[in-house]
Amino acid sequence: MKIIFFDIDGTLICGGSELMSESTKEAIRIARANGHICMINTGRTKRLVGENLTGQVEFDGLLLGCGTEIEFHGKQLMHKTFSMEESKAILTAMKKYHVDAVLEGSREDYAPRGEEVFTETFRHMAREIENRKYDRYANAPGNYDKLYAYAETPAGMDGMKRDLSEILDFIDREQGFYEIVPKGYSKATAIRYITDYLKIPMEDTVAIGDSNNDLPMLRYAHTSIAMGNSSKQVLETADYITTDVDKDGIWNALRWLGVLDK
């Protein structure tokens, strides 16, 4: 039996679509029918996963927000959020270094409005922020899980790192964007948690991803598979490279793995 961890964006779905291909859904159905455990392992928080995604095909569990929330068969096993004190320190540093971010929580997201916005990039995102009905920073209670942040110059994010490196980890998503998570949490720590919980040996773990925030789980899992559309770092890290997400990448990955065999 294998336990297989799937990223979402660029791995299960592509191009801004929330729809999985028929070959992806069928591959997951067959793998589960053959006794293997299939789990989502994503940077998205629970609010951004939604039933329109998980309702397309059944998964055994969800590892969410880069390891900050874990569910198995609908039961929440753990959930890490920022404290009010940590939240205050984060917002203070963002203002100090002119860093914009969406504060991502399990139930609500928070985004800058008006004078809270520092960068042109986020000003251009104002309509999207309005459409998604993000709440204001001022209403953030502190119990959000992670941040998706942007700084127009490297100095801005460097300042955040200097001030907050004891409580935060920073994942470079390129072009000035960063995923920022509580210190010590990642897709790899999520795998460690769930495999310890289920008492599954490491040699049975498989991770499939495409982007830099997948690197921790790809390096941690016994077997790592990169989508054909992966970043350079991911392609250099993986044990196997499958085809692109829109070219039956998941089907071909699971076929190579042998979990589709009867």
Residue ranges, per PLM feature:
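Short, structured coil segments at secondary-structure junctions
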Residues: 55-58, 65-66, 163-167, 220-221, ...
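Mg2+-dependent phosphoryl-transfer enzymes with acidic/Ser/Thr/Gly-rich catalytic loops
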Residues: 1-3, 21, 179-262
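Active-site phosphate-binding/coordination module
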Residues: 19, 23-118
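Short active-site oxyanion
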Residues: 35-39, 59, 145-147, 203-205, ...
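Conserved acidic, metal-coordinating active-site core of Asp-based
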Residues: 93, 97-100, 104-217, 229
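Asp-based phosphoryl-transfer active-site loop
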Residues: 2-17
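Short hydrophobic/aromatic-enriched beta-strand-loop microsegments
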Residues: 59-65, 80, 170-172, 224-228, ...
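Short, hinge-like loop/turn segments at secondary-structure boundaries
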Residues: 56-59, 79-82, 118-123, 187-189, ...
